[in-house]
Design a protein with these regions (language model features):
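A short mixed-secondary-structure module that forms the rim of ligand-binding clefts
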Residues: 46-80
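A short, Trp-centered hydrophobic/proline-enriched beta-strand micro-motif
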Residues: 20-34, 73-77
Length: 146
């Protein structure tokens, strides 16, 4: 099988295309490690600041233990045209009360299921990117974004 030939891409467009894709895709996949076993699941970010992604979770969920043991994670965003953004990063717990309240106020789903920002089960992770890559269609080549 030959390698697909994607449309030509101006390198100066890559950062904006990557940001647009992150804004468009509602449910990226989050990869963590469970010991030596990779785990992958869809997540619904509760806030996005460029390539900094915030994910809410419950402390009782498996990914909480996985992230506690290994903070290295990767998010993969893919649209219907198979364009991808991969954000490799470090997950850190958000303790900033003002930021938590902003996230809470903007997310009715959190409010509905958890009742209060002070719910002891709530944990919010900030994914600090260490690497961001973009792939156009099925080109099989990534462009470095960050």
């Amino acid at each position: 099988m030959s390698k697909p030939t994607p449309e030509p891409l101006d390198p100066s467009q890559i950062p904006q295309r990557a940001l647009d894709l992150v804004k468009k895709v509602r449910f990226p996949m989050l990869a963590t490690m469970d010991g030596d076993q990779p785990r992958l699941r869809p997540v619904s970010p509760v806030r996005t600041d460029g390539f900094i992604i915030y994910i809410a979770n419950l402390k009782s969920y498996g990914k909480t233990k996985e992230i506690e043991a290994n903070q290295k994670v990767e998010l993969c965003y893919m649209d219907e045209d198979h364009n991808q953004v991969r954000i490799t990063g470090i997950a850190e717990v958000v303790y900033d009360r003002a930021l938590l309240e902003q996230i809470w106020a903007a997310n009715r789903l959190l409010q509905h299921y958890l009742g209060t920002v002070d719910n002891p089960q709530l944990i919010v992770y900030k994914i600090n990117p260490t690497r961001v890559r973009y792939m156009l269609e099925w080109a099989l080549d990534y462009y470095e974004v960050q």
